[in-house]
Amino acid sequence: MSDAAQAPASLTMTAKSRLDTTRLQKMAQAYWESAALMAAVELEVFTAIARGHDTTAAVAKTVGISERNAERLLTALVAMALLTRESASKDSRFANAPDVQRFLVKDSDRYAGPWILFTKPRWAAYGELSERLRNPVVKKLGAYDQFTIEDARRYHAATYSIGMGAARLFSRSVDLSGRKLMLDLGGGSGAYSIVATQTFPGLKAIVLDLPPVTVVAKEYIEANKASDRVTTLAGDFTVTDFPQGVDVVVMASNLPQYEPALIRLVVGKAFAALVPGGEMHLIGETLNDDRRGPLSAALWGLNEGVFGSTGLAHTEAEVKGYLEEAGFRGVAVHPFVPGVLSRVAGRKPA
């Protein structure tokens, strides 16, 4: 038998499919693209273009950089498909890609610039990833162990617009008609509670989160004129007693921050707090059951290694299991944000 016949198919090379380093180089240099995108947001390049300052010279003057650097940045943004250009001429006009126009122009009601910049402060820590994996300093809450009010304010300034979008999606996906009290675990800015109580008359909500976060949550609740519907409870939901008699529990976008034992603990507490017939919705970054992806969930799990929590990525089947073990029935995985978030829900028997 020839060597080629013995080799695994994935390792067999032909002249047409010869292995090279292109894929690996692209990964190694991916932070260059991140830096270009973040610089464009910080400099308000996309906003300048949307307002008609759409040539290299006009962008340079508007955002306060040299024409040479404007040319460098705009060329990269075109290659990244964030911008289009009319022609190859030096005085070509540029235009924003549709998603850029919607989410990265400052006067858009869906402006997500702070979310794009959300992970920038983590760059230095990721540069130390191998060392942090070798010598972890483990804390249950990881990066949130020493969270301050100012940390919470910066965090939710970055995540609020995305959180409100997810909250609107939740309230479109789930019928909470007739429900009276929702417990929002790790509810952050209160987005899910604000939108749900606005959507479903008669529903009130409690946002349970760390003490510094609830200070900031109150600011968002007041800004949305929801203080008569949404209150806060300061605490750590792995330790703090839950209010009883709730008929909806939501835990959203904090799944990878916790290890299985803590998720089981929290889900068990939620089950005990719910009235018979009540429901729980756990929304998070979940792995497929074959553990091959999606990448987003895998990276959020890795992120916990960077910041020293005990959390990791969970599969959809594992999350279903946490609810079923607690006693929930009819547990099912529902699509939420494909490739990013799943919604796992179940009901307490009546």
Regions found by a protein language model. Give the residues of each.
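Alpha-helical subdomain
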Residues: S2-T84, D99, L185-A350
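Conserved Class I S-adenosyl-L-methionine-dependent methyltransferase catalytic core
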Residues: S10-T14, T21-L43, T47-H53, K61-T62, ...
